[in-house]
Amino acid sequence: MPGWFKKVWYGLASLLSFSSFLLIIVALSLPHWLSGKILCQTGVDLVNATDPELVKFIGDIYYGLFRGCKVRQCGLGGRQSQFTIFPHLVKELNAGLHVTILLLLFLALALALVSMGFAILNIIQVPYRAVNGPGGICLWNVLAGGVVALAIGSFMAAVKFHDLTERIANFQERLFQFVVVEEQYEESFWICVASASAHAANLVVVAISQIPLPEIKTKMEEATVTPEDILY
C-alpha cells in the first residue's frame, strides 16, 4: 500500500483529472466560445452612413460548437435569430476542421477519465508495472492535455484563417452582407484552456508525490544495568 503522503497527492491528481472532464463537458454545452460585433455593410452602403451613424448598423454575434445567436442591425432596429451548426451551417464552414475539434474534445474526455483511473489505482495499491505507476499517470495527462491544446489551436485556426465568424454571420443571408469588426474569445474557450491547465498541474502533483519524506528516527532507550540485575 502506498504511504499517506502519496495517497494525498494521487487523490488530488484524480480530482484534477475529473475536474478537467467536467470542464470539457461545460465547454461543449455552452454556446459561448466566441463573441463579436458584425457590421451590416449592405445597409451602410445603401445610406452612405458616416462614422456617427455606423452604430445603427453594428450587431452582435456569439456562438459555440453546436449553436449560437445573432442580432442583425441594418438600420431598422435589432433582429435576433438563433442558429445551429448542424446539420446545414456546418456545410458552409470548414466541416472537416470543425468535426476534428469535436472529435479531439470527445477524445480528451476519455483520456481525462483514464488518467483519473490511473491515479485512483495508485491510491489503492502500488502497481507492479512501472507503466501503471506515476509514469502512467503522467503519460495519460500529457496525452489528455495535448489533445485539448490541439482542439484549442484548431478552433483558433478556424477563427483566424478560415473566417469562421464571418461565414456564420452571413449564413442564409441573401440581401445583406455582414463584416466582422470585432472578435473576442468567451468563457467556453477559456474553460477549455483551464482543462488543459489541469492536466499540466497534474504533472506537478505527480512529481511532488515522488519526493521522499525524511524518516523519523526515534532514539532507543539506553539499557541501564543495576546491581540487582547482576545478582539475578
UniProtKB/Swiss-Prot annotation:
The chain crosses the membrane at residues 8-28, 101-121, 139-159, 188-208. One of its GO terms (cellular component) is stereocilium bundle. GO terms for biological process: auditory receptor cell stereocilium organization; inner ear auditory receptor cell differentiation; sensory perception of sound; stereocilium maintenance. It is a multi-pass membrane protein. Keywords: Cell membrane, Cell projection, Hearing, Membrane, Transmembrane, Transmembrane helix. Disruption phenotype: Mice homozygous for an ENU-induced allele exhibit an early-onset, progressive hearing loss, with a lack of fast-graded voltage responses. These mice harbor an early truncating nonsense variant (Trp4Ter). By postnatal days 6 (P6), mutants do not exhibit any gross patterning defects, or differences in the overall number of outer hair cells (OHC) and inner hair cells (IHC) bundles compared to controls. InterPro entries: Clarin (IPR026748). The keyword Membrane applies. The keyword Membrane applies. It is found in: Cell projection, Stereocilium membrane. Detected in inner ear, particularly in hair bundles of auditory hair cells and is enriched in apical stereocilia. Detected in eye, but not in brain or muscle. Belongs to the clarin family. Plays a key role to hearing function. Required for normal organization and maintenance of the stereocilia bundle and for mechano-electrical transduction. This is Clarin-2. It comes from Mus musculus.
